[in-house]
Amino acid sequence: MAAQQNFDTSLFKYILRYSWKAQIFIVIVTLVSLPFYYASLDVPKQIINKVLDTKHRDYLQSPKFFGVGLDLFQGDKIWLLVFFCFIFFCFVLINGGFKLYINVLKGKLGERMLRRLRYQLYDTILRFPLPHFRKTSEGELINMITAEVEPVGGFIGDAFVTPLYQGGLLLTAIFFIFMQDWSMGLASVALYPIQGYLIPKLQRKVRALGRDRVREMRKVSERIGDTVNLAREIRAHQTGDYERADYADRMGRVFDIRFKIYNLKFFVKFLNNFLTQMTPLMFFSFGGYLVIQGQLSLGALVAALAAQKDLLSPWNELLNNYQIQQDSQQKYEQVVTAFNIDGTLPMEKPIDRVEPLKGEIAARDATVTDEGVTLLERVSFGMQLTERVAVVGAGSSGKDVLAQMVAGLVRPSSGSLRIGGRDINELPPAVLGRRIAYVAADSGLMTGTVGDNLHYVLKHRPVKPADYDPGEAALRRSALAEAAIAGNATDDIRAGWIDYDVLGVKDEAGLKQATLTTLRMADTLDDVYQLGLRVTIDVKRQPELVARLMKARAAMRARLADAANATLVEPFDPAAFIMNASLAENMFFATAAAVAFDPDKLGENAYVLAVLQKTGLEDEFMQIGLGVLGNLLELAGDGGAGGALLADVSVVKLDELPDYKPLVDKAKRDGAKALDGEERAMILSVPFKLVPTRERHVEISDAFKARMLEARKAFAAGLPDKLKGSVEFFDPEKFNTQLTLRDNILFGKVALNQAQAAQHANAMMADVIAELELHDAIIEAGFGFQVGTRGSRLSAAQRQKLAVARATLKRPDLLVLAEATTALDSASDARVVDAVLKEFKDRGVLWAVQKASTARRFDRVIVMADGRVAEEGAFAELEKKEGSALSALLKAE
């Protein structure tokens, strides 16, 4: 594909292309402001010469017309002074108003253009050729869009108006000085040529160092991204010290560059300030001489000095603008060069309706290369869009590349691939994206809920406008209008984007049923059910479900009341100390709903400390905390078996344990009272996370339990109004919105000291849920489970099954999979394959399978070897064929 020149490499061309009208308007306003500035410079001179100078009469003479003039303010210089001061005040307001208005216009224009640039960069990422993502780290792209273009936005508003405005102020002030005396004017500009030559030259060196700094910081961003993505491997292989050394070395290089930049910048500032201060010296010496000689009035000298002082600001602004312009051009070039790459997809036009794909997929001598390496070589094959075809081969056979090529994710560098009689390069991205689905082993999930990820494939365009009240509608129209001005998308993200027509349903209920069917096909229905038990829900939004869950709680309590089950779960009893709950839960008898009761900082909470002191528990908590920490530090120093025991520690993070050692040593040496307030808070926070049945080495006496129950009553009784929304108390008759569905049904703590208590309790709860027909409702609640960054809160198998479900949900004409179920066990893998093939009985499936034996379930098999099609045909025929490539793969399993 031909190279796409997505951006002009000249920043000024980019600015003019998208903002020339706004720039012209700001320029006009700037030009209009200059006469008022000039007039303001003349007023101080008039005050000195016509009011304060005793040689002048006590009135102001107006200009004469036809020899007749009018004398103003006769007889009183005070009123004359008031008049001139009022005029000066008016000019101050006018000039300040112009400056405010121009600055607001500049700021708005700069922000609009920055928004446009960031949007265009993000849009370009969406159109990057997929192989390019292997060469560019996400850290680099994120840094370029968020940080590197930030200064560019600030400069865009200043690009034309600042040189014009500040240059206009400078020239106006210089012109005014020349009008007082030409020699003073020459003195005012005598040093500018020196500054104009030296300072830009030094700034060029600063820019060169700036480019080096940007390159180094991109590498640092890439390394940080690697650290985040490989955190598990770094921890598993204990290579943290190596990573720290590598990071320190990189930051050392950045430090050296930045220090050189600072040295040059401050030298430039020193040089500029030094040369600038020479001009007043020339004014005082030469101008004073002229006043003494009577060749210049005192008012003119004072006005010239005031004007010269006004020269400093615009001159410095011009120099600063020049530096910013050079920096911005440099940053802009570096960013857009990284985005002007070959193979970028063209911008597509919106398509409302996409016709189904029909006919045949035909590859003829298709070759795929990447960075000079041939991945597929002269591949030819054909399949009907009603066939189910397996692709088998070794790991490096090219079967995964073949799948990507058929899905339109990589394009043939030579040869052809036709789908439904049309070359794949001619098919719009909308056709490929809506009529073909692709799933790989590493298919990612978006940050969001399970439902967000499943329904993501149905969000091609807004299909239903959002419902707004009149006030919200006006605000939204204004926001979308601003987006249009900034060249951003104007589709309303709050509109209904889920296209029910794709599924052949009409409403939310139909969508839920279609989703449940798809989850069942992908063998992940039980996974989502289990996730549903782990979510919290909003009582106001789902009152019917809450009522049904409260019935489940009552049924669960009835079953647990049986003597055989009574010890499985310790209920939330207001009058009992709960051995399987933390000390914080025992004291509060509630769950925290705000950061005010952060479990890691309860020792700092003034109200909690007041309750401890009131009930005489503070010293006991301190001793428990010191004892627990002492045991942990002893285990940590033990290594071996001690290290294994530390893996179960929940009261303190292991990487923070060394921070407590000086505190424990100090308390042992000098007593707990020797600890200061911050140190006591750290120790007191530890016991709150202690669960008695888990940390069995901590003895919990009956007297301590009694005092904890007193503290529970005191905590609830004295809770300040401002903190009442920060906790939600355990109430047997009320649904707790801070607890998961599972914990709301159990409404207690599973016994940690009883073998298989959790399994028995879960089985009992499953029976209750089935009896009350809550299973599907909990699965629907599971749609709201947050999957984490890239699905990090899910297992690899769960991520793969959800990816398969997501792809099949959009009802594609062709489903392409590349080893999409590698994390599944054999039984689950077989169920998913069979269910998908059954669902796609009359549609196309191309599946690059991990095991060759899986291919026996498909209509046909394509065998890949070394990037070529080794053979193809029916599985049974190829299996029987002597010396076939398929039989060799089967023997290798």
Regions from the PLM with identified roles:
Residues 1-40, 46-88, 94, 98-106, ...:
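Membrane-integrated ABC transporters
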Residues 23-34, 161-212, 285-296:
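Transmembrane helices of ABC transporter permease
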Residues 50, 60-61, 358, 459-509, ...:
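C-terminal portion of ABC ATPase nucleotide-binding domains
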Residues 88-95, 192-197, 265-279, 285, ...:
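Hydrophobic alpha-helical segments in the permease module
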Residues 136-139, 212-260, 327, 332:
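Loop segments that connect adjacent transmembrane helices in multi-pass transporters
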Residues 236-239, 263, 310-338:
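Cytosolic ends of transmembrane helices, especially the final helix of ABC transmembrane type-1 domains
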Residues 339-387, 838:
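Primarily ABC-family ATPase nucleotide-binding module
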Residues 407:
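Helix-to-loop junction immediately C-terminal to a conserved catalytic motif
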